[in-house]
Curated annotation (Swiss-Prot):
This is Serine/threonine-protein kinase SBK1. Mainly expressed in brain. The active site is at D153. InterPro entries: Kinase-like_dom_sf, Prot_kinase_dom, Ser/Thr_kinase_AS, Ser/Thr_kinase_Sbk1. The gene is sbk1. The keyword Amino-acid biosynthesis does not apply. May be involved in the control of neuronal proliferation or migration in the brain of embryos. It comes from the Eukaryota. It comes from Danio rerio. Residues 348-361 have a biased composition (Low complexity). Changing K61R: Loss of activity. ATP binds at L38, G39, K40, G41, T42, Y43, G44, K45, V46, K61. One of its GO terms (cellular component) is cytoplasm. Residues 32-297 form the Protein kinase domain. Residues 328-338 have a biased composition (Polar residues).
Length: 385
């Protein structure tokens, strides 16, 4: 196990180097038919396209050269490709190129959008649907963590769905992903998913990336899915709802916080572990597997519990590099050598959160069949129910 971080480091660096050496400048319209824009933002856009040679739908992610360093583009693309063997992580087509204005890569298209679209505000998803989604996201995070990587931007906008019942979901957007233990600069601003240790403005020197921040965000995500609300606006003493939760976590009061009273004792035990105030005391995301067979909501029903096993090996890593080297990054590549996702008709979307915590903040364009769900609101009045 001690050699795993070194293996991951070498492979990611090799993928980045290979991509940089083979990055071609192309005209998008020559190889793709643009169907529509899926989203746009400060850093770029995402288009739904049809590959003129393969005839397959895919999503092209465009990152503006003016605001994106080549190093950042290469890192996001390489990490995405490196993680794509996991069936619960968005798949890649092995296509990366540049235009005069953008760095571009292609990934699969999910027709049902993202998780944010289907969570009814102040209601939440039915418990069986939420459990299906949570189970798959937990597997994806366990896989990512087994590769010594931390996502750092877990939220509904970054979980793509392939049907409204969440029978198939995938984790996406690895622009913020870094190796565990890497030093990073402190980011100004917070979102409800930000762990308390990252909200501490008294620490100005930055911090080291840690798995526990993903665990915290995962716990908040679970709350949002089940309730349609955020538990707080920010994990800071100035937030009344967070402080109420802190008193309960520290067992200074026996009363369950008002917005947590809808949960069963079993699920509250799960939340205590996922949202431990001290990061070293947080459990891993796989802790949720032990609770899938129990009821989570006082007025809900239990979903089905299916055990899943993660198999991660260095052989799998080497196979990915070999596949990468056997093809060109160009969209003109022979289709027989291309890396194809496991299924067609997928969608990728970017984060809609305007927080500077994400390097990829996008506004989603209207779809042909817009979802009926409203936007999750984050004002204090809406949070406390």
């Amino acid at each position: 196990m001690s050699s795993s971080p070194v293996v991951s480091r070498d492979i990611l660096e090799e993928l980045q180097l290979y991509t940089a050496q083979n990055l071609e400048k192309l005209e998008v319209n020559k190889y793709y038919e643009v169907i529509r824009e899926l989203g746009k933002g400060t850093y770029g856009k995402v288009d739904l396209v049809i590959h003129k040679i393969r005839g397959s739908k895919m999503a092209l992610k465009f990152l503006k050269k003016k605001s994106t360093k080549l190093k950042s583009f290469l890192r996001e693309y390489s990490i995405s490709l490196y993680l794509s063997p996991c069936p619960f992580i968005i798949n890649m087509f092995g296509i990366a190129f540049e235009t005069d204005e953008y760095y571009v890569f292609a990934q699969e298209y999910a027709p049902s959008g993202d998780l944010f679209d289907i969570i009814p505000p102040q209601v939440g998803l039915p418990e069986p649907v939420a459990k299906r989604c949570v189970h798959q996201v937990a597997i994806a995070l366990e896989y990512l963590h087994s590769k010594k990587l931390v996502h750092r931007d877990i939220k509904p906008e970054n979980i793509l769905i392939f049907d409204k019942e969440c029978r198939k979901v995938k984790l996406s957007d690895f622009g913020m992903t870094r190796r565990a233990g890497s030093p990073v600069k402190r980011v100004s601003g917070t979102i409800p998913y930000t762990a308390p240790e990252l909200c501490d403005t008294s620490k100005h020197d930055g911090f080291c990336v840690d798995y526990s921040t993903d665990v915290w965000a995962f716990g908040v995500l679970l709350f949002c899915m089940l309730t349609g609300n955020f538990p707080w606006e920010k994990a800071m003493p100035s937030d009344t709802f967070y402080e109420e939760f802190v008193r309960w976590q520290k067992r200074r009061t026996g009363a369950v916080p008002s917005q947590w009273r809808r949960f069963t004792d079993e699920s509250l035990r799960m939340f205590r572990k996922l949202l431990a105030l001290e990061q070293e005391r947080r459990c891993s995301v796989k802790e949720v597997f032990a609770h899938l067979g129990h009821r989570w909501m006082l007025d809900g029903t239990s979903g089905n519990h299916h055990q899943s096993v993660l198999n991660s090996s260095s052989e799998e890593d080497e196979l990915l590099v070999d596949r990468m080297k056997q093809q060109t990054l160009s969209p003109t590549a022979n289709t027989s050598n291309a890396i194809e996702p496991g299924s067609a008709n997928h969608f990728t979307s970017m984060s809609t959160n305007s927080s500077v915590s994400s390097t990829n903040s996008y506004e989603r364009s209207a779809r042909d069949s817009p979802p009926t769900s409203r936007i999750l609101v984050t004002t204090p009045i809406e949070i406390c129910v």
